[in-house]
Every structure is written in C-alpha cells, then in structure tokens.
Amino acid sequence: MKLLTLGINHHTAPVAIREKVAFDPEFLQEALHDLRQHLLGANQSGLPEATILSTCNRTEVYCAANDANAANILHEATFDWLAKTQQLAPSSLQPHIYSLPQSDAVRHAFRVACGLDSMVIGETQILGQMKDAVRTANDAGVLGTYLNQLFQKTFAVAKEVRGSTEIGTHSISMAAASVRLSERIFEKISEQKILFIGAGDMITLCATHFVARKPKNVAIANRTIERGQELADSISAQDVQAESLKLSELPGRLHEFDIIVSSTASSLPIIGLGMVESALKQRRHKPMVMIDLAVPRDFEPEIARLDDVYLYTVDDLGVMIQTGTNLRQAAVSQAEAIIEDRVGNFMHWMQGRNAVPVIQDIQQQGERLRQLELERAMKRLMRGDDPQEVLNAMAQGLTNKFLHGSLHALQHSNGAERDALIKLLPKLFASHSKPEDH
C-alpha cells in the first residue's frame, strides 16, 4: 500500500493562490467521490482511499492506493485532478505544491495535527478541522483501512504531544492577533462598534477576545439568522450590546461599524469595493479596520487601496503570531522527537499490513496440503491399514509438500537470488523452541 499527501499551504503559497484551491465544505463529499473515480481511472488496483483537508491556511489531499507503481501514479493523478477540479493551469499550481510519499506523508499528518505546521505554532483548531475532514471522508465511504488507521494514530500522537509538552503555551491565536491589529488603529476597543460576518468557530473565538475589551456594541451578520442570534445572545449575556443582522442588510449598515471581522465559507467575496466606498462617504472617511480570516477571501482585495481602510488577511496576521517562537522552541523539539518515534511505529504497522495477504496465502496453502494428506490417511485407515504406517506416511507427505517449494526455488536459483535464499531459508525453518523430552 502506498501513501501520499499532496497539498498547498501558507508556507508555499499566498492567500491569493490558496483561495483558488480551497474546497467548499458543502461539496466536499462530492469532491471525494470524484477524486476516487479519477484515481480508479488512473489504473489503480483496488479502491483508493482519500481524505481532503481544506482550511484557510492549507488544502491537502491524503491518498492511499494498493498498486506497485502507486507512488508516481498517485502524484500525477492527484495533481491532475486538483488542477482540473479547481480550474487552474498546472503551471500556475505546480510551484506551490508539495508531494509527500509514505513516511513523509505520515510525519506531515502528525506535525499538522500537533500544530507544528500551523501559522500559529501549537494552535489546537487544526486538530478539530482534521477530525471534521476524516468524518466527512468516512461519511462519503472513501476513508478506508489505511487512512483510518493513519488518522486515528495522528489524533493519538496529537493528544500525546499536547499532554507531554508545552507546545501551545506561548502561542498567539488568530483571534488575539486580530484584536492587537485593531488596537494599532483604534487605541480603545471599548469606544468602537464591531461587526462580525459569519458565526462559525473562528468568529466565535474572535468575538470572545473582542468582547473582553467591552466594545460599544456588536453585530453578527450571518447566512442563517438563527445562528447569528445565538452568538449575539451569548455576547449580550456578557453586558455588551449585541444584535443579529441579515447579510442583505450589510450594504445599508456597513458604515456604522469601525471594526469588521469576517470568516465565512463563501466562495465569492461578501464585501465589495463599491460597498466600502459608499460606507466611507457616509462615515466622512473615518478609518475602518477590516480583518479577513476567510479563504477564499470575504473582502475584495481592491479594498486595500482605499486610504481610510486598513484591510488585513490571514497572511498579514502571520507576522504578529510569530512572537513567542524562542519560548516554544524547546517544546517543538520535544514534539518532533515524539513524532519521529511514532512515525517509525506506524510504518512498522504498515509493513505488517502489507504482509497480511502473503500470510493468508501461505496459511490457505498449508490448510489445503493438510486436508489432502488427512483425506489420504483417512482412506487408508478405512481400508484397515496399520495406523502407525498411516501416520508415518501422512507426516512424510506433509514434510515433503511443505519443503518442496523452498527446495525447488533453491535448486533452480543462481547468483544473488541463490545467495539470498541461502541466508533466508534457515531463518524460515528455524525452530523457535527446543522439543521437550518425554
């Protein structure tokens, strides 16, 4: 079985590229089915396994396939599928892609789950996102034995690393960085009005950090008004005035807000240049801070050219969250050591799994030989032959049949193959214990 991780992340590509490769969560199962069919069409034997992890900072395809030439086939087929599915020219995607086979794929999965490959070193949100990706693949019926085992081991390693190191102790989250960036423009958050667009985990986390500064008021604009109202109610319970808006209300109310934080799964921008220009006129060009945590982006990038708008993307926040790196270095080294050991364990498991078909074939062949000799012995006993002679003949027959294949291979081999067999056969037939004396 061959493993492969092919992807793109914040290390290899800017947000302008990453947003073109990101998958809409609503269509992820459909994409997984399409990927499997594409891999099947690439001359794969058996059913390929697949999982897609798509977040604001990375899009990764994890694959497993049972084929002697699977490594090259998996890379070519998966890259071709990704480029075609996201309607990108291969030449524009290739410079940003990484392709990790076998143990490199395992190591990468472990590092991602532990937060070692994140923009925020040690952050925990990625682990939940990986679990969601695995759940989606399982629901789609494309997870399979090998990837399921890989991710179960991945989650166990992440738990071990977080429990035995201080990997997340000194990290600064995206939410905290959003507050700090806003405070560069507005000294007191308590005097500002804040708009959150979206109501998912990221916005909920951001709201927690901003609400701690007791802003003047807060509004939640979300696709489903009920979810937005739930978040608004939880904010109101903290003595901060909050309300829920429909997305359709944004053009008429955008000018009311000083700080706007957005993180949705929309495939198209929610806030356009014209909408912001109109809002600035109504504000008489009072500054606005806009923080875009979405991939694909929720704000049209042209907005950044406006003089009175401070637009930040996830890549911009990356500069702030690098603080604390030196303090985390010892924990990172400890985590890497744990991961390296667990990679070896998983690869040993994979090698054992690869031997299962051979073991089953040998066991089935042994059973056929046993049954054949047993039937012959039973017939002789039915004829009244001497039981001692029958037992001796059955034992001799089993011995000859079990040794025939190995001796035949040795006698008809030469060169390096013969040398290898001479070293191997004694190990195969070595006794594991001395016979007991009776």
Swiss-Prot record:
Matching CDD domains: NAD_bind_Glutamyl_tRNA_reduct (cd05213)
Key words of the record: NADP, Oxidoreductase, Porphyrin biosynthesis
Binding site for substrate: 55-58, 118, 123-125, 129
Reactions the enzyme catalyzes: (S)-4-amino-5-oxopentanoate + tRNA(Glu) + NADP(+) = L-glutamyl-tRNA(Glu) + NADPH + H(+)
Classification via Pfam families: GlutR_dimer, GlutR_N, Shikimate_DH
PROSITE patterns attached to this UniProt entry: GLUTR
Active site feature: 56
Residues reported in the UniProt entry to bind NADP(+): 198-203
Pathway in which this enzyme or protein is active: Porphyrin-containing compound metabolism; protoporphyrin-IX biosynthesis; 5-aminolevulinate from L-glutamyl-tRNA(Glu): step 1/2
Domain notes: Possesses an unusual extended V-shaped dimeric structure with each monomer consisting of three distinct domains arranged along a curved 'spinal' alpha-helix. The N-terminal catalytic domain specifically recognizes the glutamate moiety of the substrate. The second domain is the NADPH-binding domain, and the third C-terminal domain is responsible for dimerization.
UniProt function note: Catalyzes the NADPH-dependent reduction of glutamyl-tRNA(Glu) to glutamate 1-semialdehyde (GSA).
Name of this chain's protein: Glutamyl-tRNA reductase
Source organism (scientific name): Polynucleobacter asymbioticus (strain DSM 18221 / CIP 109841 / QLW-P1DMWA-1) (Polynucleobacter necessarius subsp. asymbioticus)
Taxonomic path: Bacteria, Pseudomonadati, Pseudomonadota, Betaproteobacteria, Burkholderiales
UniProt gene name: hemA
